[in-house]
């Protein structure tokens, strides 16, 4: 009977509760790390484009509005200063006077003229004249700088909108990882799936074990990262993620769980971070989805429930059972102990089979007696009969 996310087998004593480990990576993929005491903040300004893209949406929109409003105000103030310096504001009623900008009678009019110039929406009755060289230079500068502001801000907003972060939200990981036998070997497994019909191209999976360790010299490393092989050597880490897949890490001699039994694993303190990467089929941009598993989320002796069924002409995926597991017979010893036991069993079988064959030969030979020459020419238990003797004349 299927059981969903059961942590222990019936009748088995639950290990003592430990203090909850602080996650390094949240289940939704957010890294639980905050940068503190960063004194060289000028480095953020050297890469202003990335800084603006990484801002929250409300701050990005605020910067977007301020960028345009400030440039309009800045150039509007300069247009007003030119008109004030040339005396245009004092000759508003003088028809013989040629101003720098026609019908510019105050700061508000200068501000509106600045907006019309930078946005190139066309002029109304405010038009620059050819009697104002400083105005012509300012017009060129505002046109060039306005184009630069447009390119920069529109580029930032486009990149921010087209970021594949939301695409990663439709890449799901199983809520638990499991440990069970696969082809006679202990394996750590978890499941990944894609909720969208458009696929992830060149998808690849990685897994890292994060736990504290102490070196031989006494150095304490609080978040040491160790790679967990999920098929890099065989190419199994490259996924064709059309339907949910179970990713397997074989616990062999190169695995950090080689000597971990069920009891030792439940008492350990670690975090397994899984990273799924690929390109979004629609945009070609790289997408990365992350999740993690703590010790309490690793179920020993469980296997994932199948979610794929064959219907009339197509395969159907039932995501209602995506996170479900069920218990299977699994030894509680470590992978090393299991391999040693299998080696001893193989050695015992290797030496016991010839001895049993010899015993069978002796029993059959004693039953036939000395007069059983007819059966002497037959093969017995894989042994060839002796060659025939020469006939006597």
UniProtKB/Swiss-Prot annotation:
Pfam family, one: IRK
Intramembrane segments: 107-118, 119-125
Keyword rRNA processing applies: no
Subcellular location: Membrane
Membrane spanning stretches: 58-82, 135-156
Superkingdom: Eukaryota
A GO MF label: G-protein activated inward rectifier potassium channel activity
Region feature (Disordered): 1-23, 360-393
Motif (Selectivity filter): 120-125
Motif annotated as PDZ-binding, chain positions: 390-393
Primary site of residence: membrane
Positions on the Cytoplasmic side per record topology: 1-57, 157-393
Reaction equation(s) it catalyzes: K(+)(in) = K(+)(out)
UniProt site positions, description: Role in the control of polyamine-mediated channel gating and in the blocking by intracellular magnesium: 150
Topological relation to the membrane, as annotated: Multi-pass membrane protein
Coiled coil: none
Compositional bias annotation for Pro residues: 384-393
PANTHER family: G PROTEIN-ACTIVATED INWARD RECTIFIER POTASSIUM CHANNEL 3, INWARD RECTIFIER POTASSIUM CHANNEL
Subunit text: Associates with KCNJ3/GIRK1 to form a G-protein-activated heteromultimer pore-forming unit. Interacts (via PDZ-binding motif) with SNX27 (via PDZ domain); the interaction is required when endocytosed to prevent degradation in lysosomes and promote recycling to the plasma membrane.
UniProt remark on domains: The PDZ-binding motif specifically binds the PDZ domain of SNX27: the specificity for SNX27 is provided by the 2 residues located upstream (Glu-388 and Ser-389) of the PDZ-binding motif.
UniProt name for this protein: G protein-activated inward rectifier potassium channel 3
Native source species: Homo sapiens
Encoding gene, per UniProt annotation: KCNJ9
């Amino acid at each position: 009977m299927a059981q969903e996310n059961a942590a222990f087998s019936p009748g088995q004593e639950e290990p003592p509760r430990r203090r909850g480990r602080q996650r390094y990576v949240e289940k939704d993929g957010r890294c639980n790390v905050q940068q503190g005491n960063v004194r060289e903040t000028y480095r953020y300004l050297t890469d202003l484009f990335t800084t603006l893209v990484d801002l929250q949406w409300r701050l990005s929109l605020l910067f977007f509005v301020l960028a345009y409003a400030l440039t309009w105000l800045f150039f509007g103030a300069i247009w007003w200063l030119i008109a004030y310096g040339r005396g245009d504001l004092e000759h508003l009623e003088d028809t013989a006077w040629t101003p720098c900008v026609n019908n510019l009678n105050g700061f508000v009019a200068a501000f509106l003229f600045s907006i019309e110039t930078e946005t190139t929406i066309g002029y109304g009755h405010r038009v620059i004249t050819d009697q104002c060289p400083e105005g012509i230079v300012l017009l060129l500068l505002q046109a060039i700088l306005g184009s630069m502001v447009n390119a920069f801000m529109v580029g930032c907003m486009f990149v921010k909108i087209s970021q594949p972060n939301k695409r990663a939200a439709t890449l799901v990981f199983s809520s638990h990882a499991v440990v069970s036998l696969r082809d006679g070997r202990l394996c750590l497994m978890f499941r990944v799936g894609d909720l969208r019909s458009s696929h992830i191209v060149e998808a690849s999976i990685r897994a890292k074990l994060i736990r504290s360790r102490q070196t031989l010299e006494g150095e304490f490393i609080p978040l040491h990262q160790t790679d967990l092989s999920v098929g890099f050597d065989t190419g199994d880490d490259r996924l064709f993620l059309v339907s949910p897949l179970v990713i397997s890490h074989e616990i062999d001699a190169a695995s950090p769980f080689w000597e971990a039994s069920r009891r030792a694993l439940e008492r350990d303190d670690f975090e397994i971070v899984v990273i799924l990467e690929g390109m979004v089929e629609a945009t070609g941009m790289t997408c990365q989805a992350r999740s993690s598993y703590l010790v309490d989320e690793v179920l020993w002796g469980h296997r994932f429930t199948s979610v794929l069924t064959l219907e009339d002409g197509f395969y159907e995926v039932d995501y209602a059972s995506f996170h479900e597991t069920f218990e299977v017979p699994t030894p509680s010893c470590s992978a090393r102990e299991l391999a040693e036991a299998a080696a001893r069993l193989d050695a015992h079988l290797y030496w016991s089979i010839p001895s049993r064959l010899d015993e069978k030969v002796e029993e059959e030979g004693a039953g036939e007696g000395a007069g059983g020459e007819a059966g002497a020419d037959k093969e017995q238990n894989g042994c060839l009969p002796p060659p025939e003797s020469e006939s006597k004349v």
